[in-house]
Amino acid sequence: MSLVGCHILSIDHFSRQDLEELLMTAKLLEPVAQRKVRCNVLDGSVMANLFFEASTRTRMSFHTAFARLGGSVVDTTGFTFSSISKGESLSDTARVIAGYADVIVMRHPDQGSVAEFASKINVPVINAGDGIGEHPSQALLDYYTINNEFERLKKNIDGMTIAMVGDLKNGRTIHSLAKLLSLFDNIHFRFIAPETLRAPAELLELLRSRGHDVQEFDDIANGLPGTDIIYATRIQRERIKDGELMEGYSEKFRINAAAVARYATPETIIMHPLPRDSRAGAFDLSTDLDNHPQLAIFRQADNGVTVRMAIFAMVLNVHRGIESFFSPHRGFRPDRYGQGDADFYQLK
């Protein structure tokens, strides 16, 4: 389907053809993200960034993406700083903000709330995370990252094996990425989590119904060997209600240098949507992997700007012929940053 003027609420909206078009658009925009050229295709357009839940990367990434295309951004963060704290309904907020902006990016702690907001207006709304629901733009940048890493390694997404580790129950990035990968052929999914944090049964059923191999494990020793991708995610402590337990989540689920050396291959890519929890007892992706050549988490985060530029360009129908809006970049530019960190790791 065409993304022009559409809400982006779920990966369910995408076909494999849509992914290919997004990939091509993002490739065109890489020089803009890398500050090699400038682009003003959205000069005069306004994006409203509505974040009712904590965010660093996603909020700033969307803001940067729109600004690098020449657009302007208006922001609000948290309920405290919005009229919702005064009793305004989500419906009223939607109608008012739609009068200000050409596109709206929204994050909300309640599943389904972004879709409810979008149903009230005709301005395109992009879901930046709705509780334990979905995070479609994260899945799209994860796909873009996997594609880039596999191009380097001369691998195909079709037939790959991915291990998803951590809080699979509450981690919306897992839900969206698994749905996206199910559009490909013969994917081998390995879900690694304790009983209390297992992936939703309906997600596993969907993947199996599309002909994919789905296995569940309760430790990394059995789940990691032979994987092409390790996708770790933190425990969503903010979504675990009082009285609920993380029973069984321990060091045996932690992805660290020792585990990677023992169970992974030299070509296994290590991913994480970030933030990772560095506190004691969190058992999140270890910092002892920070200099590992196959650690892609920062390339992954950098790709967010590129992919979100592509989303804006396609939704606002400026993606075709966008190169005509490129102009030379002016000012200081670092020798290496963003996607260029592959040079630092001496990756070819």
UniProtKB/Swiss-Prot annotation:
GO terms for biological process: 'de novo' pyrimidine nucleobase biosynthetic process; 'de novo' UMP biosynthetic process; amino acid metabolic process. Belongs to the aspartate/ornithine carbamoyltransferase superfamily. ATCase family. Its EC number is 2.1.3.2. One of its GO terms (molecular function) is aspartate carbamoyltransferase activity. Catalyzes the condensation of carbamoyl phosphate and aspartate to form carbamoyl aspartate and inorganic phosphate, the committed step in the de novo pyrimidine nucleotide biosynthesis pathway. Pfam families: OTCace (PF00185), OTCace_N (PF02729). Pathway: Pyrimidine metabolism; UMP biosynthesis via de novo pathway; (S)-dihydroorotate from bicarbonate: step 2/3. This is Aspartate carbamoyltransferase catalytic subunit. Heterododecamer (2C3:3R2) of six catalytic PyrB chains organized as two trimers (C3), and six regulatory PyrI chains organized as three dimers (R2). InterPro entries: Asp/Orn_carbamoyltranf_P-bd, Asp/Orn_carbamoylTrfase, Asp/Orn_carbamoylTrfase_sf, Asp_carbamoyltransf, Asp_carbamoyltransf_Asp/Orn-bd. The keyword Transferase applies. Carbamoyl phosphate binds at R57, T58, R107, H135, Q138, L274, P275. Gene3D superfamilies: Aspartate/ornithine carbamoyltransferase. It comes from Dichelobacter nodosus (strain VCS1703A). Keywords: Pyrimidine biosynthesis, Transferase. Coiled coil: none annotated. One of its GO terms (cellular component) is cytosol. L-aspartate binds at K86, R172, R234.
